[in-house]
Amino acid sequence: MELSEIRAELENMASRLADFRGSLDLESKEARIAELDEQMADPEFWNDQQKAQTVINEANGLKDYVNSYKKLNESHEELQMTHDLLKEEPDTDLQLELEKELKSLTKEFNEFELQLLLSEPYDKNNAILELHPGAGGTESQDWGSMLLRMYTRWGERRGFKVETLDYLPGDEAGIKSVTLLIKGHNAYGYLKAEKGVHRLVRISPFDSSGRRHTSFVSCEVMPEFNDEIDIDIRTEDIKVDTYRASGAGGQHVNTTDSAVRITHLPTNVVVTCQTERSQIKNRERAMKMLKAKLYQRRIEEQQAELDEIRGEQKEIGWGSQIRSYVFHPYSMVKDHRTNTEMGNVQAVMDGDIDTFIDAYLRSKLS
C-alpha cells in the first residue's frame, strides 16, 4: 500500500467522522448525559426503581455512542500522526504496522456506522409489514404475492422468523392484502426502508394480448410493541368483530369464528388477525397491531406538522413510489430515493434487497 493511498484512506475517515458527529448530535448527547448523571446523583434516585433503571439504561446507551465516537477520533488522530512521521522519515516496518492498524480501524468504523444506522427508537423491535395492491385487479394482486415472497425470502436469509398475521387471497391469483410479523433483532430498523409504493412494469401473463402493464403495491411497516409506548386505547373506542379465517392455515380455517377484526372508532383504523387457532390470541395480536398503527399515525402527524413549519411538500399516495421493478423492455430494479440500481431482477425477487436497504439507511445517516 502506497503512502498516498494511506493518506486517502485517512482523509475518507476524517470525512466519515464529521458525518458521525453530525448524526450523533454530539453536543446535545453530552448535555443529556450530564442531565442524567445529575438525576442519578440525587439521594432519592432509587425510590422509583423502574424509573431509575430506565434512566440508567438511557445514560449507558448514550455513553456507549459518545465514548465509541471519541475512541475512533483518537485512533484516527494517532494514525494520522504516524502517517505524518512516515512522510518525514520513511520506515518500512512502521508503514506495515500502520497498514495493519488502518485495516483494523476501518472495521471499527463500519461497525460503528451500523450502530448509528440502527440507533433510532424501536429499530431493534420486530416488524409488522403490510402489503396492499393498488387498482389493477389480478395483475396488481399477483404483484402483491411476488413481494410477499420477496420479503419472506429476505427474512429467511437473515435468520428471522416470518409469521402471517392476516391473509386475504386474490380473486384469481395473488393477494388482496397480507400482514406479516417479522421477528428478529433490528427487523424494524431494516424494514422501515421498505415503506412506500413499489411499482412493477412487465408483460402481464394475465393479458392474452401480451401488453405491458404497470402495477403498484403499497408497503406499510411498523414496529411491534410490547410495553415500550404509552398508547391509551379505551374499551369504548374499539369495535371487535369475529369471523371465519379465510387464508392458508391449518384445519381450523373456516371451521370456527377465530379471526378478529378490531376497528378504532375515533380514527377509523382497522386491523385484522387470523393466524392463531384461538380467538383470544388473535385478539391479543390484533391489539398489538392496533397499538403499532396508532403509534405510526401519531409519528406521521408530528412529521406532517414539522414539514408544514418547514414549508416542505411531499408526494403522497400512489405517486410516492420508492422503487421500480422493470421486467420489460429491460431488466432493472431502481430505488428512486437513492438512485441505487440492480440489473439482476430475479435475485431481488428472491430476497436480495440488502443493497437497497443499506443505501437508504446510509443516505439518512449523511
Curated annotation (Swiss-Prot):
GO terms for cellular component: cytoplasm. Belongs to the prokaryotic/mitochondrial release factor family. The gene for this protein contains a UGA in-frame termination codon after Leu-24; a naturally occurring frameshift enables complete translation of RF-2. This provides a mechanism for the protein to regulate its own production. Keywords: Cytoplasm, Methylation, Protein biosynthesis. This is Peptide chain release factor 2. It holds the Pfam family RF-1. HAMAP family: Rel_fac_2. GO terms for molecular function: translation release factor activity, codon specific. It comes from Bacillus subtilis (strain 168). PANTHER family: CLASS I PEPTIDE CHAIN RELEASE FACTOR, PEPTIDE CHAIN RELEASE FACTOR 2. The gene is prfB. Methylated by PrmC. Methylation increases the termination efficiency of RF2. The lineage of its organism: Bacteria, Bacillati, Bacillota, Bacilli, Bacillales. Peptide chain release factor 2 directs the termination of translation in response to the peptide chain termination codons UGA and UAA. GO terms for biological process: viral translational frameshifting. PROSITE patterns: RF_PROK_I (PS00745).
